[in-house]
């Protein structure tokens, strides 16, 4: 934090709560926009699943400056998406509230560049969120719409000018964020781009299988295996997103209702953009730095929100065309998917390094006795 009496752990706890608040706020606004008939149970379960499946608990387990920057970036991304969705849902006659949401959302997304620059890729989601009002309805061509567009852009410009001035003063270029100057295990300036790194990293990020054992905490770390002849930076890994978080499996059902999804182009575009950004960030991370478990935080939050939208969409489809067997399956699968994500992150928290067995053996042993 740069403040002697404010270690990273304290603001990280606050950021974690803000992250969870943004998840629930986003899902609520998404339900208001696309799923007005969504049940309270579906809203609470999807929001709880997106909040509990995230890596914020793992980051809190390692409260260093590096994890602090990652959590800042992830929190700002979700707040930006939430505020933009609030702006899209705010009636145009409430100009002050509408302008506030636009400005605050853009400010949050602009601040991401100062924390975790690659996460700014999710700013592309502003297009499908705001497109219907400002392009389809041609509000951008009006005087008030132009003013709102200026309010949307102004925070980005101001933060960009400040960051570019800082980068130029410290690193000699307005576009150099200093990532290559990390004192780490390898020369960041000579990593380059190697196609051979992509497939192993992407598979592990998205579908890696964690190690399992029969005693608490039931998960063990694994290491990425690769035939790539160059250097690949890796750390202990605890499983890929799609392999360990069943909430994400809801995305697989979207092609089954592609016609209904096609009638909601903005929703379809939001989900597709999240998937594209997820793959892009997985590739960027493995090329820029390596295959590290905490790098899932760069894209896992928006991906879980997309999965929440998929589950809400499934419920809306079954409300419009009830099929008792599928409705029952949905009502059973969604709580189980959320519970599985909670259990997975619970196990990771006690299995991950630095292990609580050494840091807080009393807590570890008490929980172990309660669970086993």
Regions flagged by a language model, labelled:
Residues 71-92, 107-109, 123-126, 302-309:
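Specific aromatic-rich, kink-prone transmembrane helix
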Residues 7-36, 79-83:
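Transmembrane-helix motifs of polytopic, lipid-linked glycan transferases
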Residues 78, 100-116, 123-124, 155-163:
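Membrane-interface alpha helices of multi-pass inner-membrane proteins
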Residues 122-157, 259:
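Perimembrane helix-loop-helix junctions
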Residues 86-110, 143-147, 151:
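Short hydrophobic alpha-helices at membrane interfaces in multi-pass membrane enzymes
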Residues 23-55, 75, 91-100, 267, ...:
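Transmembrane-helix signature of polytopic, membrane-embedded enzymes
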Residues 1-14, 32-37, 59-63, 226-237:
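Juxtamembrane segments of multi-pass membrane glycosylation machinery
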Residues 226-268, 307:
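Hydrophobic, aromatic-rich transmembrane alpha-helices
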């Amino acid at each position: 934090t740069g403040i002697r009496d404010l270690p990273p752990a304290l603001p990280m706890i606050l950021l974690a709560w803000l992250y969870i608040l943004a998840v629930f706020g986003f899902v609520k606004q998404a339900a208001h926009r696309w799923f007005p008939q969504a049940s309270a149970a579906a809203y609470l379960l999807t929001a709880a699943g997106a909040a509990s499946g995230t890596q914020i608990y793992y980051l809190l387990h390692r409260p260093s400056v590096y994890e602090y920057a990652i959590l800042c970036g992830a929190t700002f991304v979700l707040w930006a998406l939430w505020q933009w969705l609030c702006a899209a849902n705010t009636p145009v006659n409430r100009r002050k509230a509408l302008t506030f949401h636009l400005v605050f959302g853009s400010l949050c997304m602009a601040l991401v560049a100062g924390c975790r620059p690659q996460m700014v890729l999710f700013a592309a989601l502003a297009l499908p969120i705001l497109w219907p009002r400002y392009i389809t309805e041609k509000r951008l061509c009006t005087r008030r719409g132009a003013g709102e567009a200026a309010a949307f852009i102004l925070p980005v410009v101001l933060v960009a000018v400040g960051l570019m001035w800082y980068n130029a003063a410290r690193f000699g270029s307005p576009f150099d964020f200093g990532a290559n100057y990390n004192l780490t295990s390898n020369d960041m300036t000579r990593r380059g781009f190697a196609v051979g790194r992509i497939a192993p990293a992407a598979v592990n990020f998205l579908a890696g299988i964690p190690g399992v054992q029969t005693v608490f905490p039931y998960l063990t770390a694994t290491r990425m295996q690769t035939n790539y002849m160059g250097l690949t930076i890796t750390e202990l890994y605890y499983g890929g997103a799609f392999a360990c978080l069943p909430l994400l499996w809801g995305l697989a059902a979207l092609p089954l209702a592609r016609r209904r999804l096609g009638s909601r182009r903005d929703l379809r575009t939001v989900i597709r953009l999240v998937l594209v950004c997820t793959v892009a960030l997985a590739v960027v991370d493995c090329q820029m730095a390596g295959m590290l478990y905490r790098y899932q935080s760069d894209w896992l939050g928006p991906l879980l929100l997309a999965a929440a939208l998929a589950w809400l969409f499934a419920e809306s489809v079954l409300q419009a065309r009830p099929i008792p067997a599928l409705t029952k399956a949905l009502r059973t699968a969604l709580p189980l998917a959320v519970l599985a994500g909670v259990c997975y992150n619970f196990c990771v928290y006690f299995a991950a390094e630095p292990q609580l067995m050494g840091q807080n053996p009393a807590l570890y042993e008490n929980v172990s006795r309660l669970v086993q």
